[in-house]
């Protein structure tokens, strides 16, 4: 509401002055100018979330704060008490509304506000349309891409939990997780889970836990509720904060039918907070049974292996070569001895045969040779050179080969005789 003060003289004086460091405008002049500009704006329609409603007893004016969750910007709106009582919707902090009002500037305190003339609640259908529009936007940017999902550690060192203070969701996660894995540790951050401050508090808690090196997984948990109750978890700022986390995030908001956008951005969706507890830590009893089963299977596998190897050894030892290892050597030794004896006998036989053959040939040679002929009374006659014992020609075969006076060498069986030819003899 613009404060009514006499401004003509002040405004005209300020307008006639050249504004500078030497000629500054007084505060009232500036405030009046701003008030004049704002008065010319007319009425505007504005959408936002009711963050605060202040209705003091006996006060005629009600002050409210209209907030834009996506930008964390607020605007003061005012209306009469009767306007609130006659409003077509039940005004409560956290609801999304569309208001119509006249901008005004209160000169006394230099504050800007919006004087309401109409207010309407944003319908569920419209909320769903906006959520779907945001879903398509985030999907087009790749925030739902399965390839970007970070794996949940099998056994996290510490579990970060963001949930309402003393809520059933907190109790479900911690109780079930501790029952499944008694050594589980938690870093719990209690925040508003609906209302005007929910988004900023959850985003701040997310960033704090993401910076904590001990926290290896973060669970965002809330129980079920209406579309309006869960609107916080379809907020664009929160969705982008989850996508920016380096730590894996599990969304456990609402119940099975609920599907806020943070479910799609998170690395893993849990149907309920209890389901999140089951997914964030293994069941110690199940793991113990698994280990025991693996131990039994390993022991049985080892026993089976030993049995197979024992049977193999028995089979190998039952083979003749291993049952009586010297038998093969003895057999081979006997074969070698037999071969040696056979070779020796064959060599003796061959030597004997060849000796006999040589003796037979020697006998034949002796029988057919000249010595045997001489022994039977024959003689070999050869001519000698004069005055020497040197044989000059071959064996004489004709009387013409030994004319008279030829010196001759006559070989008989036991020696040789030198003679002189006296010519041809009569008779044969």
Swiss-Prot record:
It is an enzyme of class 3 (hydrolase). It comes from Mycobacterium leprae (strain TN). This is Exodeoxyribonuclease 7 large subunit. It is found in: Cytoplasm. Belongs to the XseA family. It comes from the Bacteria. The gene is xseA. GO terms for biological process: DNA catabolic process. Keywords: Cytoplasm, Exonuclease, Hydrolase, Nuclease. GO terms for cellular component: cytoplasm; exodeoxyribonuclease VII complex. CDD domains: ExoVII_LU_OBF (cd04489). The lineage of its organism: Bacteria, Bacillati, Actinomycetota, Actinomycetes, Mycobacteriales. One of its GO terms (molecular function) is exodeoxyribonuclease VII activity.
